[in-house]
């Protein structure tokens, strides 16, 4: 999923989300649309492609039913690690430090991940979106302490005004047992099955 621009709209109504997704692809020739349900009863519409069509599609989606929009994000120069992480790619390595940004929306987590990656030389260990999190989002950054601090700070600044930032922590020298758990999986059930 490598395209220069990415937009995502998060809806609290499945019907409104489907309506918006239809309007988005009818309005502009985006390269790709991915849409579907996530917990708890939300609907996500993600489009990628060239900047202008993605921006047009986003505007059409937001206009279709603005009352059902929980949050949205538009990234005209999305960092390459973000689409990979959305597609569930994980980077199984924690270096010197771990940074975690917790959000109340999927869109805010994606925005935070992009901002953090652009601010510092870090790896996006994982981007967790909604399912198994009660609709929350989590961005996990790994790298040297100063870079992780810069990534987390930039993430927080980028999404602070949205009201969707729940928490952000930096853990230098993560204990090896905790690191092993996080590298294997961040879902509890995955680790015990």
Task: List the model feature ranges, each with a label.
Residues 2-41, 56-88, 96-136, 142-193:
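Long, contiguous binding/interaction regions
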């Amino acid at each position: 999923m490598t395209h220069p621009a990415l937009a995502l709209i998060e809806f609290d109504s499945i019907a409104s989300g489907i309506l918006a997704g239809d309007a988005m692809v009818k309005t502009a020739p985006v390269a790709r649309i991915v849409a579907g349900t996530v917990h708890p009863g939300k609907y996500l519409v993600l489009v990628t492609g060239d900047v202008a069509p993605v921006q047009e599609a986003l505007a059409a989606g937001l206009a279709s039913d603005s009352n059902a929009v929980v949050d949205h994000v538009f990234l005209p120069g999305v960092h390459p690690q973000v689409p990979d992480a959305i597609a569930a790619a994980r980077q199984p390595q924690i270096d010197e430090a771990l940074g975690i940004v917790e959000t109340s929306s999927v869109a805010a987590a994606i925005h935070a991940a992009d901002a953090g990656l652009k601010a510092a030389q870090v790896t996006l260990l994982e981007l967790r979106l909604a399912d198994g999190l009660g609709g929350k989002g989590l961005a996990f950054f790994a790298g040297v302490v100063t870079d992780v601090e810069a990534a987390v700070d930039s993430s927080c600044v980028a999404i602070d005004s949205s009201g969707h930032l729940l928490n952000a922590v930096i853990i230098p020298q993560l204990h090896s047992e905790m690191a092993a758990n996080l590298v294997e999986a961040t879902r509890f059930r995955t680790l015990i099955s």
